[in-house]
Amino acid sequence: MLSGILIAALLMTLWGGWQPDIAHASDEFDALRIKWATLLTGGPALDPADSDIAARTDKLAQDANDYWEDMDLSSSRTYIWYALRGNGTSDNVNAVYERLRTMALAATTVGSSLYGNADLKEDILDALDWLYVNSYNSTRSRSAYNWWHWQLGIPMSLNDIAVLLYDDISAARMATYMDTIDYFTPSIGLTGANRAWQAIVVGVRAVIVKDAVKLAAARNGLSGTGIFPYATGGDGFYADGSFVQHTTFAYTGGYGSSVLETTANLMYLLSGSTWSVSDPNQSNVWQWIYEAYRPLLYKGAMMDMVRGREISRSYAQDHAVGHGIVASIVRLAQFAPAPHAAAFKQIAKRVIQEDTFSSFYGDVSTDTIRLAKAIVDDPSIAPAAAPNLYKQYAAMDRAVLQRPGFALGLALYSTRISSYESINSENGRGWYTGAGATYLYNQDLAQYSEDYWPTVDAYRIPGTTVASGTPIASGTGTSSWTGGVSLAGQYGASGMDLSYGAYNLSARKSWFMFDDEIVALGSGISSTAGIPIETVVDNRKLNGAGDNAWTANGAALSTGLGVAQTLTGVNWVHLAGNTADGSDIGYYFPGGATLQTKREARTGTWKQINNRPATPSTAVTRNYETMWIDHGTNPSGASYGYVLLPNKTSAQVGAYAADPAIEIVVNTSGVQSVKEKTLGLVGANFWTDTTQTADLITSNKKASVMTREIADERLEASVSDPTQANNGTIAIELARSAEGYSADPGITVTQLAPTIKFTVNVNGAKGKSFHASFQLGEDTSGPVDPGEPELPSVIVDNADSAGVTRTGTWKTASTQTDRYGANYLHDDNAGKGTKSVTFTPNLPIAGSYEVYLMWPAHFNREDAVQVDVGHASGTTRTAVDQRSGGGVWHSIGTYEFLAGSGGSVTIRNDALGSPDGYVVADAVKFVAVG
């Protein structure tokens, strides 16, 4: 307890010199404060007749009323709420301020039944006074129990309350509250999400007290570690779209979403003011949406594999979090440069409309509802196309495949990234959520919502290989071989060298992601722990009755709960989904398998996985079908292989099993490889630094490689060092002949025939995929001069010192990896019809040349980019669609050219597509033909 003398001193501080509110002259700070208040409440123009806004304000008023009724308002009180007694416990004090913030919102939001309620406001202010004396003042330690509450959580709530009730708070009272915040959070010096929270605390307080120096410091804080600049280690956003917090945890949908929200709000607040952000690195924020969030959002849900310990929070399930991220995208759309604002609106509209499970408007603020409805109701805004991609997040050991109708997330760990986070009594059963876990999303949008995490068997997470019934400790792994390769942003291969030291369990695990199938391989599975080892094929939440139909090899299986089965000679399985269509799953087992299955009702509580005070302890029950492969006790060199076939009917799965599109090339502890015959794809993971071959691919080092052969004319290849530890090169040989090529910097082609040979310099590449494209055909010229493409094939890159002429202002960018060379040019989606880039080759001989273009693709590109080819007979105009096909050469025809520099290719930014988009100029290739 505080001494009587100290209490008196604090009261004198609070009330000394008390005076009624002073009418200050309106200035820019007042405008910013009102802008922040509008962000919180929707402002005076909020339409209470709108049904979604009314539902939100009704809920707000109900929550506030419930809190108000439960308050202890007595003069002798020793707490504000009995349930949150314990005034020195930081989480309780933080929760008290959060409740008072809710009450302040109800008192100041148009349409709330408590709007303008003077008694409510007075009780809030009395509670703040009591808290100042008893809980939150400058005599407190800044870090007792949990520093986050004192320095970030409580100040954010108190700032908002001060803005909302600004006209009801005396100058003396306000100074006391603001001085306390300044005591706990005087400056900005942390990283990642914590830095963003510091910036918003300092910034909003600066607006309230009209401190220009502190407001500038808040703005400048965004330019620090873990926010605007891309991280190269530790916390923050990475150039590949990864987000890491606490040094080793993948957190795009957890701390990353907080960085996004807080940064978007502070940038919005300052936009158009004296303190608006001018740091050029703010452009990275726009890329967060494209690279970090668009691939990881599925129909309103944020993928759980990047939410860390937050998956154990009952109030923050995947759709609620996804809606919060979309709310931040809506906020960014209010002030981002026009092309990005337009793209953000399209993305937001698509996600809001396609989430048929949970209403977006039920999870966001009244102001966000107002802004989002303006987007959704605008017929001139077309929803963005659904993602169709494969993306490797090398910096956080994650990968994602998105296809129309389904998505698959893959969560791995390594010496760089930890398996799971469990601190502050949260995520107590997260053991295998990042240990080779697969997350399959389809039209069953409730799969990972509605109490999945407290009820799923946490020892059997899909995709994992485990010692049966045993947990693993949180931490980084013992092997650096985790990662994969992306080919053309559409296909990929990933792998993990698994080792659980506690159980002497090791395995090599790979996943090959093609168009509508995911192939999972395991090899070298060994253990001496005396515990059964198993690989979990799936653990799917079923419908409410638990009676989803399922078949094995076409024969119906029991749908009774509590039934466990051993199925032998299984070639394929089909499991009916929880929706009328779009949620069935097929499983194909090449060569057959013995499958263990269990259908059961599972009961659990959120409290069992999150032991925080406010976590509900009510039991919930859900039904599951679990399938796994039993490798036996103390296996040595065991293996497995299966194929996931999302959204296929039973008949389609049976037909696939009879004539599979995939072929397992090899599955050993040295190399794992799969061929997709219909697409011409071969993927291979090489596990050792010895020369090994898989199909057409030979590698001399640890590597992940994927190739695609297109119509016997072109061979695309991508290579990465998933270990991120090779400080030299990888030598690749492909059993094909070529007559020309293009390649990323870092690739040196040494031979085109009778086989293709090249090396990849992966020193410092940090898991990046390197791309090369080969024009197939016979070559008789012998070895290629390293570093120079074989003539007569000439490439002109935008970065070349000669042969490139710009008209108008073009910006240089390097964000996208499906580019040629170090960077590319874009027109900033401005000055349409006034800009061009002309590529002029110096051709060694006269004759016919086939002309190719390469560009980094993006959905915000122009779909009809005008291209003029200047040749010996005149000029020919053609058009290309830059929204897709990035990172590969596209032929635009064959033309006659004179020797020398008389020919050219001009890329124009005429606005002829619909809708208008960015135009990029990257590279042009001229290949002589016979």
From Swiss-Prot:
It comes from the Bacteria. Optimum temperature is 50 degrees Celsius. Stable at 4 degrees Celsius at pH 6.5 - 9. 60% loss of activity when incubated at 45 degrees Celsius and pH 7.0 for 10 minutes. It is found in: Secreted. Its main location: secreted. Gene3D superfamilies: 2.70.98.10, Chondroitin AC/alginate lyase (1.50.10.100), Polysaccharide lyase family 8-like, C-terminal (2.60.220.10). One of its GO terms (cellular component) is extracellular region. Xanthan binds at residues 146-148, 246, 255, 309, 313-315, 424, 612. GO terms for molecular function: calcium ion binding; D-mannose binding; xanthan lyase activity. Keywords: Calcium, Lyase, Metal-binding, Secreted, Signal. CDD domains: CBM6-CBM35-CBM36_like_2 (cd14488), GAG_Lyase (cd01083). Its EC number is 4.2.2.12. The active site is at residue 255. It holds the Pfam family Lyase_8_N. This is Xanthan lyase. The lineage of its organism: Bacteria, Bacillati, Bacillota, Bacilli, Bacillales.
